[in-house]
C-alpha cells in the first residue's frame, strides 16, 4: 500500500462529500461576523456537518491565525503573529451561546513570541465560555507553551473539562514532522497537566501514514499511558499541499479498528480511531461523568 511516488492515490474510503447546507452556511457567517476562526473550516474537516449540526460541537482557534512554528504536516499560516485580542474570549463565548453548543474545543496557534505562550488568553476564554454557557463542556488543545510549568498552571487553573495536547506522531519521526517541538516535552506537558488537576481527563492524538511502523505506534501508546493520558485519537495523515510531507501509507479502516482495540486494552478510557478521525472527533463523549451531567442541561 505504501509507495515512494509523489502522489499516493487516495482510497475510496477517504472520498467523501462535504455537506454544506443552510445550517452550515449560517454558522460560517456567524464566525465571520465575530472575526473568529474555527479549525473545522480552516482544515476543511470532513466531519464538520456532523459536529456542528448533529452533535452541537465546534473547535475554535484563538490567538490569531498565524503560527510561530512551521510544522511540516500543518496548513496553518506561519509568520509574524497578530497582536493579542483581549475581546476574543467574550466573542468566542457569545458564539458558543448563539450556536447552542453542547461541547466546545478551544485550540490555538503556537505563540512562541509570547512569554506565557498565550496561556492567559486561553484561560480567560475558558472562563468566559463558562460564564455565558455554564452547561457547555470545554476542551482545550494548546501547544506545549514552551514547556513552561507556570504557563500550563495558568491554563489548568481555569479548570477545563479536558486537557488535550497532541504528540502528533511517533518518537522517531518527531524531529522531521514538528521540528520546533520535542516528543519528550509533549509527554512532560501531559504528565504535569494530570499532576496539576488529577480529576481532569488528559488526551492526545496521533496521525499515521507518515512512515511509522505498527510497533512505533504501540510504543507511543505505551508512552502516553506511562504519562497518565486517558484518551487517544488516531487518524490518517492527509497532505495539505505539495509543500507538506507526503503520505507514505493510507491505512485501511480494519487497521484502525485493530489499533483502537490495542489502545483500549492498554487502559485508555476512550479511543477514536479511523481514517477521518481528527483530534476533536466525538469529543463530547470523552468528558468525565460530572461533566456529562452538565451537558444534559445544555
UniProtKB/Swiss-Prot annotation:
CDD domains: Radical_SAM (cd01335)
Alphabetized SMART domains for the sequence: Elp3
Binding site for [4Fe-4S] cluster 2: 67, 71, 74
Alphabetic keyword roster: 4Fe-4S, Cytoplasm, Iron, Iron-sulfur, Metal-binding, S-adenosyl-L-methionine, Transferase
GO terms, molecular function: 4 iron, 4 sulfur cluster binding; lipoate synthase activity; metal ion binding
Cofactor annotation comment: Binds 2 [4Fe-4S] clusters per subunit. One cluster is coordinated with 3 cysteines and an exchangeable S-adenosyl-L-methionine.
Domain Radical SAM core: from-to ranges: 53-269
Pathway: Protein modification; protein lipoylation via endogenous pathway; protein N(6)-(lipoyl)lysine from octanoyl-[acyl-carrier-protein]
Domain of life (superkingdom): Bacteria
Places the protein is found: Cytoplasm
Pfam assignment, any one: LIAS_N
GO cellular component, one term: cytoplasm
Major location category of this protein: cytoplasm
Binding site residues for [4Fe-4S] cluster 1: 40, 45, 51, 280
Reaction(s) the record says it catalyses: [[Fe-S] cluster scaffold protein carrying a second [4Fe-4S](2+) cluster] + N(6)-octanoyl-L-lysyl-[protein] + 2 oxidized [2Fe-2S]-[ferredoxin] + 2 S-adenosyl-L-methionine + 4 H(+) = [[Fe-S] cluster scaffold protein] + N(6)-[(R)-dihydrolipoyl]-L-lysyl-[protein] + 4 Fe(3+) + 2 hydrogen sulfide + 2 5'-deoxyadenosine + 2 L-methionine + 2 reduced [2Fe-2S]-[ferredoxin]
Signal peptide: none
Cofactor: [4Fe-4S] cluster
EC number per UniProt: 2.8.1.8
Family: Belongs to the radical SAM superfamily. Lipoyl synthase family.
HAMAP family per UniProt: Lipoyl_synth (MF_00206)
Listed name of the protein: Lipoyl synthase
Native species: Geobacillus thermodenitrificans (strain NG80-2)
Organism phylogeny: Bacteria, Bacillati, Bacillota, Bacilli, Bacillales
Amino acid at each position: 500500500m505504501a509507495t515512494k511516488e509523489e502522489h499516493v492515490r487516495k482510497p475510496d474510503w477517504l472520498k467523501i462529500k462535504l455537506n454544506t447546507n443552510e445550517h452550515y452556511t449560517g454558522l460560517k457567517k456567524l464566525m465571520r461576523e465575530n472575526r473568529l476562526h474555527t479549525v473545522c473550516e480552516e482544515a476543511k474537516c470532513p466531519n464538520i456537518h456532523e459536529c456542528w449540526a448533529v452533535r452541537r460541537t465546534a473547535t475554535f482557534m484563538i490567538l490569531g491565525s498565524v503560527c510561530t512554528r512551521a510544522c511540516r504536516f500543518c496548513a496553518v499560516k506561519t509568520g509574524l503573529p497578530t497582536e493579542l485580542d483581549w475581546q476574543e474570549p467574550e466573542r468566542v463565548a457569545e458564539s458558543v451561546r448563539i450556536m447552542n453548543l453542547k461541547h466546545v474545543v478551544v485550540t490555538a496557534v503556537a505563540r512562541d513570541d509570547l512569554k506565557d505562550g498565550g496561556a492567559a488568553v486561553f484561560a480567560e476564554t475558558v472562563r468566559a465560555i463558562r460564564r455565558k454557557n455554564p452547561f457547555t463542556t470545554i476542551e482545550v488543545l494548546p501547544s506545549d507553551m514552551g514547556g513552561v510549568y507556570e504557563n500550563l498552571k495558568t491554563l489548568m487553573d481555569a479548570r477545563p473539562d479536558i486537557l488535550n495536547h497532541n504528540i502528533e506522531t511517533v518518537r522517531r519521526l518527531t524531529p522531521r514532522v514538528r521540528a520546533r517541538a520535542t516528543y519528550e516535552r509533549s509527554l512532560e506537558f501531559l504528565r504535569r497537566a494530570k499532576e496539576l488537576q488529577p480529576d481532569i481527563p488528559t488526551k492526545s492524538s496521533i496521525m499515521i501514514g507518515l512512515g511509522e511502523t505498527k510497533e512505533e505506534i504501540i510504543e507511543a501508546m505505551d508512552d502516553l499511558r506511562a504519562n497518565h493520558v486517558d484518551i487517544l485519537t488516531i487518524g490518517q495523515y492527509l497532505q495539505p499541499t505539495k509543500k507538506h510531507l507526503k503520505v507514505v501509507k493510507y491505512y485501511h479502516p480494519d487497521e484502525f479498528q485493530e489499533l483502537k482495540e490495542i489502545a483500549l486494552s492498554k487502559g485508555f478510557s476512550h479511543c477514536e480511531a479511523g481514517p477521518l478521525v481528527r483530534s476533536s472527533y466525538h469529543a463530547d463523549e470523552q468528558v468525565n461523568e460530572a461533566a456529562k451531567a452538565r451537558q444534559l442541561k445544555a
